[in-house]
Amino acid sequence: MIGEMRTPETISTAVTAAETGHLVLSTLHTNNASQTIDRIIDSFPGDQQDQIRTQLSSSLLGIFSQRLVPRIAGGLIPAYELLLNNNAVANLIREKRTHEIDVVIETGMEQGMVDLNHSLLELVRAGEISIENAYQFSLNPKGLERLI
C-alpha cells in the first residue's frame, strides 16, 4: 500500500512492483480514471513517458475513483467510477488516447466497469442523494441528463 503517488520515483517503484506480480494499491487526487492515468504519465519527463505508458498499460488492473456526495439523510456517500484494464484500455494508454477512456467505461459495463453517472443515478433512484447533487457532482451533466 502506497499512501499517495506524488513523485516519479514513487510511481516507478509502484509500477515495477506491479510488473513483478505484487498487488499495489495507492491513492491519487484526481476526479476520474483518465485523469489518474494522465497524472501518472505527466509526472514523468517527456523522454520517459512512452516507457511509463507501456508499463502502465500492461501492469494496471483497474482504477477506482470516488466522489463523496452529500446524502439526503445527512453525511456523505461515495459515487464512483470503476475502470478495469482490458485490451482496449491498454491500447488507449499506449496510443496517448486516454481522453477516450470514458467511452470504454460506458461500453464496458457488461465487464463490470461503472461510470460515474450510472453510480450517481443509482444513488438518486435509491433515495440516497438529490438529483441536484447528482448534477453538481457529475463530470458530464449532459450525459447524466440522457440517462434520466
Across the structure, where does each feature detected by a protein language model lie?
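Short, flexible helix-loop junctions that flank or precede catalytic/ligand sites
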Residues: 1-148
